[in-house]
Amino acid sequence: MKTSAQQLLSLLLLPLSAIAAPTGEIEARACSTVTVIFARGTTETPTLGTVIGPQFLAALKSSFGGSVTMNGVPYAADVPGFLKGGDPTGSKVMANMVSSALSSCPNTKLVISGYSQGGQLVHNAAKQLPAATTAKIAAAVIFGDPDNGSPVQGVPAAKTKIICHAGDNICQHGSMILMPHLTYGMDATAAAAFVKQVAGS
């Protein structure tokens, strides 16, 4: 029989396992019609950011009747990661999150998406996934893509939407954050309509 002290220790240790370093596993929950794995941009607040993540989620919920889950990738989102072509650890975590989501909810419409450095993570994660996994991705949507012009490996061009504003230096493979890079919230509705079109209801 456990002593009261042992029982207390067990209760104290239980939450620690729940907040271990992120591995990319998706928390068990009821499966949604649409599941989005989203990577925010450099210096944005975890985990969906503010420029487009929340707006895109709201637009998707409107399009799909609310049955949408968006999981933000937990990663540093710092400048060194951007300069490396996308945070390596975050890229791996995103790939793991895609695999986990499809394993947990094989019938969900899986969307991979990112903004700014998050777009780099989308490209990197897709390269790390086997073809059998990328074949199950319903759509890829990137806003302000630093890798503009490059395909998302394994995802057909018809299921990929890269949104880049005129004058966005990041989309021109630069490193300057100009006003056009901060206005992608206006594209949330169009992006959601694209997902609806290619993924179906």
Curated annotation (Swiss-Prot):
Enzyme class: hydrolase
Intrachain disulfide bonds: 31-105, 164-171
GO biological process, alphabetically ordered: carbohydrate catabolic process
SUPFAM superfamilies, per the entry: alpha/beta-Hydrolases
EC number: 3.1.1.74
Endpoints of the signal sequence: 1-20
Any single Pfam family the record assigns to this protein: Cutinase
Keyword annotations of the record: Disulfide bond, Hydrolase, Secreted, Serine esterase, Signal, Virulence
First-listed, main subcellular location of the protein, grouped into a coarse class: secreted
Site residues (Transition state stabilizer), renumbered to this chain: 117
GO CC, any one term: extracellular region
PTM annotation, UniProt: The 2 disulfide bonds play a critical role in holding the catalytic residues in juxta-position; reduction of the disulfide bridges results in the complete inactivation of the enzyme.
PANTHER family according to UniProt: CUTINASE, CUTINASE 2-RELATED
Protein name (record): Cutinase
Organism per entry: Monilinia fructicola (Brown rot fungus)
